Amino acid sequence: MAKESGIGMSIAVDDSGGSARTISNDITDFSLSTPRGVQDITGLDKSAHETLQLLADFSITLNGVFDDASNVAHAVFSTVPSISVARTVTITISGQSLPNETFFNDYALTRAATGELTWSAPGVLAGGTVPTWA
């Protein structure tokens, strides 16, 4: 496998009805994290840390440009404040995909002084399934 850029990647997010919507065109940037919890179990007899690996997690923040056409970003996220459903987020790049059941907890719009209208949507792992690239 070669080193690659993120150009040409795809992100799909379920709308509140469970239909996957590819909204890559509306997303300008994103960040995701797949951390693992750790517990320090160092005994008094140790001179270095001893740890246990704990639960897996997933979080994502999608950022984009406002688009209120049908079945794109605004249609997907405008229901976040009123409908509490887990949404499948699928990130795909170079044949690799990372699907996760995600709760989005905000859909924030920002109108900058220069005029642009952008949005941000942070989400967290919902289903208890370990995030796994396939």
Per-region residue spans from a language model:
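Short hydrophobic/aromatic patches at helix-to-coil boundaries
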Residues: 2-4, 130-134
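Short solvent-exposed strand/turn elements
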Residues: 118-132
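Acidic glycine-/aspartate-rich tracts in secreted/extracellular proteins
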Residues: 65-70, 126-130
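Short, acidic/charged, Gly/Pro-enriched secondary-structure junctions
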Residues: 71-105
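Solvent-exposed edge beta-strands and adjacent loop segments
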Residues: 1-66, 96-122
